[in-house]
From Swiss-Prot:
InterPro entries: RNaseH-like_sf (IPR012337), TPR-like_helical_dom_sf (IPR011990), YprB_RNase_H-like_dom (IPR038720). This is Uncharacterized protein YprB. It holds the Pfam family RNase_H_2. PANTHER family: EXONUCLEASE-LIKE PROTEIN, YPRB RIBONUCLEASE H-LIKE DOMAIN-CONTAINING PROTEIN. It comes from the Bacteria. Signal peptide: none annotated. The gene is yprB. Gene3D superfamilies: Tetratricopeptide repeat domain.
């Protein structure tokens, strides 16, 4: 074929391509025209996201780093990230190796509280802290049949290093995985990431004083956040079902605002918990909370930090005082600091708490038998624990009698 012929053929193809592009643009314009209340949505800051023959709505809100949400300004996140990077602590909330925009604060709104394929996520909300701002982004499912667009809009721009949620390990992310599985052939893969679920820490620290360790309760009791004219989360499913029928934006504006506050509260709560863990000036002052923090350190095998917390509580009067003393004595024993452990066991041997009293008496018996070789004293101490036999398990009772029999043999030989 001549050069002229080739050029003519290319010209035809170019014309066809231009025509297809115009048709596609026309389709998209028509799709925009089909979106109910589009002008009202846009006035609220929402924009359509079109994917294939589906759409969702996206809203973006920005806050300055100086903005205070409860006790903290968002700029304080950088401070706690710096503290984590300077710390040698091993902890589930550690952000060592991260910077502030690696944390992805995430929450969802769903059509129900149960799990499984019958429960639909209709709102994905997330926040990120950048060098000069905090950005909250929300992806709304306008009606059933548009989930591919919803998750495409979310996954196409989300680069998650570590997720920060409140009950997200048990609820939010499993729900995302379930919905993603149903349409995975049309979507990018879900990312791999670390996960900080703040609910677990909240339960550890505050379950002794909160009937429900919900995010709303933690906001009021710990973060100093008072929501005004908030749409409660439990109303979200009902409002969404009304919205599906009516499509009126006013039905969901309150839900969107509630979700926005939720993800912002995750930032403040992460700052709050991190400061309690890392900063002496923010360490728990209330005795039961300080004990809970010590047990959290124990769970992470951070013995020195746990001892530091427990030593502050030795002479404090509170409900779990003897349990705290017992934990401290066992940590001393672990570090071979028996001269500090024994006085605690002797004090606990007179405790009103049967469990602590029995544990302390057994530790004293072990000490006199194995360390001091004072078998008579070990026997005397072990027999003291027979008074608690009624509250012991069958296995514990059997072990106690074996110990006493062994000590009698050693003492008489």
């Amino acid at each position: 074929m001549s050069l002229k012929g080739k050029l003519q053929r290319m010209k035809k193809h170019m014309a066809l391509d231009e025509g297809e592009q115009k048709i596609e643009a026309g389709k998209q314009e028509n799709h925009f025209d089909d979106i109910p209340f589009l002008e009202e949505w846009e006035a609220f800051g929402m924009k359509p996201f079109i994917f294939e023959d589906e759409y969702c709505l996206i809203r973006e809100v920005e806050y300055p780093l100086s903005h205070r949400h409860g006790l903290y300004s968002f700029s304080e996140l950088e401070e706690v990230i710096t503290l984590w990077n300077q710390s040698g602590l091993s902890h589930t909330l550690s952000a060592k190796g991260y910077n502030k925009n690696n944390l992805f604060f995430f929450d969802t709104e769903t059509t129900g509280l149960g799990g499984g394929a019958g429960n639909t996520i209709f709102l994905l909300g997330h926040a990120r802290v950048y060098e000069d701002r905090v950005t909250v982004k929300q992806h709304l499912l306008p009606k059933p049949g548009n989930e591919v667009a919803l998750y495409q809009s979310f996954l196409s721009e989300v680069d998650i290093t570590s997720l920060v949620t409140y009950n997200g390990k048990a609820f939010d992310w499993p729900q995302v995985k379930t919905r993603h599985t149903l349409i995975r052939d049309r979507l990018p893969k879900l990312p791999e990431f670390g996960h900080f679920d703040l609910l677990h820490g909240a339960r550890r620290l505050w379950k002794h004083k909160m009937d429900r360790v919900s995010l709303g309760t933690v906001e009021k009791e710990e973060l100093g956040i008072r929501r005004l004219e908030d749409t409660p989360g439990y109303l979200a499913p009902m409002l969404y079902f009304h919205f599906i029928k009516a499509q009126e934006p006013d039905l969901l504006k309150g839900v969107l605002h509630h979700n926005e506050m939720d993800v912002l509260s995750l930032i403040s709560l992460y700052i709050h918990m991190s400061k309690k863990i890392l900063s002496e000036s923010h360490a728990p002052k209330e005795h039961s909370e300080a004990y809970a923090m010590a047990k959290w350190f124990m769970a992470h095998k951070e013995t020195d930090q746990a001892i530091k917390q427990l030593e502050r509580l030795i002479e404090k009067s509170f409900e779990d005082q003897d349990s705290a003393r017992l934990d401290l004595s066992l940590l001393y024993k672990k570090q071979n600091r028996l001269e500090e452990a024994v006085p605690l066991w002797e004090k606990l041997s007179r405790s009103q708490n049967q469990k602590c009293r029995y544990a302390a008496v057994i530790e004293l018996a072990k000490y006199f038998e194995h360390k001091k070789k004072e078998f008579g004293k070990a026997l005397q101490v072990a027999e003291q624990s027979l008074s608690d036999a009624a509250c012991l398990s069958e296995k514990e009772t059997e072990k106690l009698h074996v110990r006493i029999a062994r000590l009698k043999r050693k003492y008489s030989s």
